[in-house]
């Protein structure tokens, strides 16, 4: 596997050290709630992401349950990013770990 899998708690700790967490869920779900400080990565926001992250930046990919994040993590590695992680359990795991979220409710 060209990337590592980490727990939501590890992801939060890495974010405190400057890692970028990207949430790849759909627009409505992201707008409703997402991990605090997450960047919403979509096809439309990819150019903005490229300006935000350099190839050595630690990047954590989060999805719904930790499955589709693996595909995006692989894609990012193929684009040249060297420090990529997939978050086990996705946003569901993040919520179960009771980590901070940004929400509209």
Swiss-Prot record:
Subcellular localization is given as: Cytoplasm
EC number annotated for this UniProt entry:
2.8.1.1
Sorted alphabetically, the Gene Ontology BP terms of this entry are:
glycerol metabolic process
Q: Which residues form a coiled coil?
A: none
- Kindly report the protein's main subcellular placement as a broad class: cytoplasm
- Pfam families annotated for this entry? Rhodanese (PF00581)
* Domain of life the protein comes from: Bacteria
Domain Rhodanese, first and last residues per copy: 15-103
Gene Ontology CC annotation, any one? cytoplasm
**Keywords of the record:** Cytoplasm, Transferase
Free-text function comment from the UniProt entry = Transferase that catalyzes the transfer of sulfur from thiosulfate to thiophilic acceptors such as cyanide or dithiols. May function in a CysM-independent thiosulfate assimilation pathway by catalyzing the conversion of thiosulfate to sulfite, which can then be used for L-cysteine biosynthesis.
Q: Which family does it belong to?
A: Belongs to the GlpE family.
Question: Do you know which HAMAP family this protein is assigned to?
Answer: Thiosulf_sulfurtr
Q: Which NCBIfam families match?
A: PRK00162.1
What is the protein name given in its UniProt record? Thiosulfate sulfurtransferase GlpE
The source organism is: Haemophilus influenzae (strain ATCC 51907 / DSM 11121 / KW20 / Rd)
User: Highest lineage ranks of the organism?
Assistant: Bacteria, Pseudomonadati, Pseudomonadota, Gammaproteobacteria, Pasteurellales
């Amino acid at each position: 596997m060209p990337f590592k899998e980490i727990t939501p708690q590890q992801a939060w700790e890495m974010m405190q050290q400057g890692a970028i967490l990207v949430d790849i869920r759909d627009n409505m779900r992201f707008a409703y709630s997402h991990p605090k400080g997450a960047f919403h990565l979509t096809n439309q926001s990819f150019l903005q992401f490229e300006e935000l992250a350099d190839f050595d930046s630690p990047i954590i990919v989060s999805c719904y349950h930790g499955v589709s994040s693996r595909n995006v993590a692989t894609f990012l590695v193929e684009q040249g990013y060297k420090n990529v992680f997939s978050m086990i359990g996705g946003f569901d795991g993040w919520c179960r770990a009771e980590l901070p979220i940004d929400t509209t409710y």
